[in-house]
Amino acid sequence: MAQDIKNEEVEEVQEEEVVETAEETTPEKSELDLANERADEFENKYLRAHAEMQNIQRRANEERQNLQRYRSQDLAKAILPSLDNLERALAVEGLTDDVKKGLGMVQESLIHALKEEGIEEIAADGEFDHNYHMAIQTLPADDEHPVDTIAQVFQKGYKLHDRILRPAMVVVYN
């Protein structure tokens, strides 16, 4: 009988320990879960911050490349009227051959310098394209001249890579 009492006491103590252990593991699991959630939160914040930094660097690189690519835009816009004036001067009657030759050389050197910077003349023959041409006058279309074709160029247009610096001013058959 003494043995039975000891066995019962041992069983009760073991049951109490099991209950206490079960109660203790639940808070430990919740603390572990909380710690894991916080770790996941920090990892998520880190990944977002890292992605944001990469986006900032990418945008800065793109902006730097665009600045480099279009650096001569303002200078070209300032030079184009002078180039137009040279063309008008060459069209004047009564100039000596030496003067025409000199003006032609200056014009060629300016055009060459602009081409080196990526500035090109916009083609102003054939069909009218509102992206590159500005219609300043219209003429009636006929059998020889279909609708939306360019009749005459008043002022040449220029572009820098894919940007329009100045559209070509043209007369269009309508």
From Swiss-Prot:
Acidic residues bias: start-end ranges: 9-25
Q: Which Gene3D superfamilies match?
A: 3.90.20.20, Head domain of nucleotide exchange factor GrpE
User: Per the record, which residues fall in region Disordered?
Assistant: 1-35
Checking Pfam families in the record gives:
GrpE
List the keywords (alphabetical).
Answer: Chaperone, Cytoplasm, Stress response
The record's subcellular location field reads: Cytoplasm
Question: Bias regions of kind Basic and acidic residues — which residues?
Answer: 26-35
Which Gene Ontology cellular component annotation is one that this UniProt entry carries? cytoplasm
| Entries under InterPro entries matching the protein | GrpE, GrpE_coiled_coil, GrpE_head
GO MF assignments? adenyl-nucleotide exchange factor activity; protein homodimerization activity; protein-folding chaperone binding; unfolded protein binding
Q: Which family does it belong to?
A: Belongs to the GrpE family.
Protein name as it appears in the record = Protein GrpE
Output the GO biological process annotations, alphabetical, semicolon-separated: protein folding
Record field: transmembrane? none
As for what it does, the entry says: Participates actively in the response to hyperosmotic and heat shock by preventing the aggregation of stress-denatured proteins, in association with DnaK and GrpE. It is the nucleotide exchange factor for DnaK and may function as a thermosensor. Unfolded proteins bind initially to DnaJ; upon interaction with the DnaJ-bound protein, DnaK hydrolyzes its bound ATP, resulting in the formation of a stable complex. GrpE releases ADP from DnaK; ATP binding to DnaK triggers the release of the substrate protein, thus completing the reaction cycle.
According to the record's subunit comment, the protein's assembly and interactions are:
Homodimer.
